Design a protein with these regions (language model features):
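An N-terminal-biased, well-structured beta-alpha scaffold segment characteristic
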Residues: 1-98, 223
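Hydrophobic Val/Ile/Leu positions in short beta-strands of Rossmann-like dinucleotide-binding domains
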Residues: 5, 152-154
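Glycine-rich Rossmann-fold phosphate-binding loop(s) that bind the pyrophosphate
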Residues: 8, 157-158
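Rossmann-like adenosine-cofactor binding region
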Residues: 41-44, 57-62, 181-277
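Phosphate-coordination loops involved in phosphoryl transfer and adenosine-cofactor binding
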Residues: 69, 148-151, 224, 233
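Phosphate-binding beta-alpha-beta segment of Rossmann-like dinucleotide-binding domains, i.e.
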Residues: 90, 97-151, 166
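N-terminal Rossmann-fold NAD(P) dinucleotide-binding loop
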Residues: 161-162
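A conserved FAD-binding loop/helix module that cradles the flavin
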Residues: 293-304
Length: 319
């Protein structure tokens, strides 16, 4: 089978132990983002594509231009990046893999700590020859602070949110939870405090961290009004999906000083270009969507996705 692995930015997949599962198949690994025109041209002879999370959108229009496509193998769970109805109509099988909260939760906590202690700014200044300086501008040259005693506001008490709560307890933070009723009840059973309202949640939290799935109900669920209700010293942490926040609202809120800071691993347009304002805001720590990007997680995700390809081939031969 001719197989394409798409948007492997770091050319990491071919170096994983599980890549050997595809021995005997013709495999092309594409490391650069491709627009629909380029994908239609380069994938015209491929029967299967392996997607890395939501990096690639498989639309009806694109599938129409891939006459040999028979299988889409998704690392992790299938999300809105695949038009499932279009795939079914065109006889394209879509198989999903497994997920794990460990890597995204750890990345979230690392970002939180880096932002709180201003680590990226200190490192940048140190490399420029400046000792114990955060910024060349006095207004931004503020020291960081410890987590102990601060309030971690968790919106979405699923697997990642629960890990964040455990990390917070280890650092002597107070946990405040907001979300749907089942989520709140689970958090209450774990001994955490519930916010009485969304407004109270944003007002009380020193850090707001979002751990929600993106769908029609959650798109833009964090509004400009919510952000304006945060403390001027507060941090907005988003490692889930940029579209959970009303378009343009967070940039405007940061410029107006509420919240005072943001730590972001996700953006509406990815990859970011070097001129993107997010990369030049002194009160923002930005990482290039690394939540699930680490060796153990990749091996887990791709082992499942590549085994799905092999299972598909085996079923096809048996039929």
């Amino acid at each position: 089978m001719k197989i394409a692995i798409l948007e492997d930015y770091q050319d990491a997949v071919r170096h994983l132990p599980c890549f050997a599962l595809l021995d005997g198949h013709e495999v092309d690994v594409f490391t650069e983002p491709l627009d629909d025109e380029a994908m239609a041209e380069r994938l015209a002879q491929h029967e299967a594509v392996v997607l890395i999370r939501e990096r690639t959108c498989m639309t009806a229009a694109l599938m129409d231009r891939l006459p040999l496509l028979r299988l889409i193998s998704q690392t992790g769970k299938v999300s809105g990046n695949v038009d499932m109805a279009a795939a079914q109509q065109r006889g394209v099988t879509v198989l999903e893999g497994v997920g794990d909260p460990t890597a995204p939760a750890e990345l979230s906590w690392a970002l939180l700590m880096a932002a709180y202690r201003r680590l990226p700014q200190y490192v940048s200044q140190l490399q420029g020859g400046h000792w114990q300086r955060v910024s060349d501008e006095a207004v931004h040259d503020t020291i960081g602070r410890a987590l102990k005693g601060d309030v971690l506001g968790i919106w979405g008490y699923g697997k990642i949110g629960q890990r964040m709560a455990r990390y917070a307890r280890a650092f002597d933070m107070e946990v405040l939870v907001w979300g749907r009723a089942p989520s709140l009840e689970l958090a209450r059973a774990d001994g955490h405090r519930m916010a009485t309202s969304k407004a109270a949640f944003f007002a009380a939290a020193d850090v707001v961290t979002l751990h929600l799935r993106l769908n029609d109900a959650t798109r833009g669920i964090v509004t400009a009004e919510d952000l304006a209700g945060m403390k001027s010293t507060a941090l907005m942490l988003n490692t889930s999906r940029a579209e959970l926040i009303e378009t343009g609202a967070l940039k405007a809120a940061l410029q107006q000083g509420r919240p005072g800071f943001a730590a972001l691993d996700v953006f509406e347009q990815e990859p970011l270009n070097t001129n993107d304002p997010w990369l030049h805001m002194p009160n923002v720590v930005a990482t290039p969507h690394l939540g699930y990007v680490e060796q153990k997680g990749y091996e887990l995700y791709f082992s499942a996705a590549l085994r799905n390809v092999l299972d598909f081939v085996a079923r096809d031969k048996a039929s």
